[in-house]
Curated annotation (Swiss-Prot):
Residues that bind ATP: 173-226
Root EC class: ligase
GO biological processes: cell wall organization; peptidoglycan biosynthetic process; regulation of cell shape
Domain named ATP-grasp: residues: 146-340
Membership in a protein family: Belongs to the D-alanine--D-alanine ligase family.
UniProt-recorded name of the protein: D-alanine--D-alanine ligase
Length: 351
């Protein structure tokens, strides 16, 4: 099977995506698939005489990509392309994807995760991993997804949606501390915990650099967990223990982080079972399929969903691979099961 691992793009999570993509490519090759990584935005330069199908015959191996400390803006990334064009799909990308039997989406954030790339693939009858275009857009939009959660009686934090016209000194219905985050962001980029009006104003200024729409949530004190769902099966939860601060971009992706991951977590069986049930319920409510990850906070008042991730990270430090490992599933088997699980869904649609 020829598999194009689509990574990169031009979101602020580009570096994380390239790390996920390189590891996925290596894993699929180790399972015998003809896999190659394609940079969505920078494209692929064909060699003389090379066809689109030949791209998958390359013997080159993908090396693990180091995640940089710096977060690139969209303008920074556009400068990386030397042909002067700014369209999302780089040179030769779409024809290569059409030549593939399957596309493994290793994209994170922006148009790679909000359903737009998925819609292009749907229109071109290209099979891909993860949720469809509508569910991807819903899951990426924190405000809409939280409204759907509340409608389905899934506990989540109180929140307000702000726009630039609301200014940086809004009147909110809940007290400090609060959490400020871009509505359609990921990897905790632009996210901060604020304790007073001055910090709120400064955080809103920063968050508006990444999104025109901002979510401000009540801060819920509790233990933080993450739980993946693969092909309808909930993985063991993993507890995230941060000793210095909170689980931000640096703690998620930098190897020097002091963050501890505990799996299986030391929690009561009924709480663990409840998180598994709510994770599956949340994905079903949002229309998500194939695989995803749901993040939680728990305390004496219950289990609260922070958010659902429709294309969770697959880097060496990412949560879903650690959860799968705790369930006895190797990284290589996890990648293969995602492809085969989505293929099964496509086959069922034909019946």
């Amino acid at each position: 099977m020829k598999i194009a691992v689509l990574a990169g793009g031009k979101s602020t999570e580009r570096n994380v995506s390239l790390s996920s993509g390189s590891k996925i490519t290596n894993a699929l090759r180790s399972k015998g698939y003809d896999a190659t990584m394609i940079d969505l935005f920078l494209g692929y330069e064909l060699e003389d005489g090379q066809s689109y199908e030949d791209v998958f015959k390359s013997s080159n191996t993908s090396t693990d990509y180091e995640i940089s400390d710096a977060v690139l803006t969209e303008e920074d990334i556009e400068e990386l392309r030397t042909d002067g064009t700014v369209g999302l799909f780089g040179k030769n990308v779409l024809p290569i994807l059409q030549a593939a039997d399957f596309v493994f989406l290793a994209l994170h954030g922006g148009d790679g995760e909000n359903g737009k790339v998925q819609a292009v693939l749907d229109l071109n009858h290209i099979k891909y991993t993860g949720s469809g275009s509508l569910a991807s857009g819903i899951a990426m939009d924190k405000a809409i997804s939280k409204e759907i959660m509340l409608y389905n009686n899934i506990k989540t934090a109180q929140f307000a949606v702000l726009h630039a016209k609301d200014g940086i000194h809004p009147q909110l219905a809940f007290d400090y501390p609060m959490v400020v985050k871009p509505n359609s962001g990921g990897s905790s980029i632009g996210t901060r915990i604020v304790h007073d009006e001055a910090e709120l104003a400064e955080s809103l200024k920063d968050a508006y650099r990444f999104d025109d729409e901002i979510i401000v949530e009540e801060f819920i004190t509790g233990r933080e967990f993450s739980l993946g769902v693969v092909n309808g099966q909930a993985m063991p939860a993993i507890e995230i223990v941060v000793n210095d601060g909170w689980y931000d971009y640096e703690h998620k992706f930098q190897t020097g982080s002091t963050t501890k991951f505990v799996t299986p977590p030391e929690i009561e069986d009924d709480v663990h079972d409840e998180m598994k049930r709510v994770a599956v319920q949340t994905m079903d409510a949002l229309g998500m399929t194939n695989y995803g990850r749901v993040d939680f906070l728990t305390n004496d008042t219950g289990v609260y969903v922070i958010e659902a991730n429709n294309l969770p990270g697959m880097t060496p430090l990412s949560l879903l691979p650690q959860e799968a490992e705790a369930a006895g599933i190797s990284y290589e088997d996890l990648c293969e099961s995602i492809v085969l699980g989505k293929q099964k869904l496509y086959d069922e649609l034909k019946k």
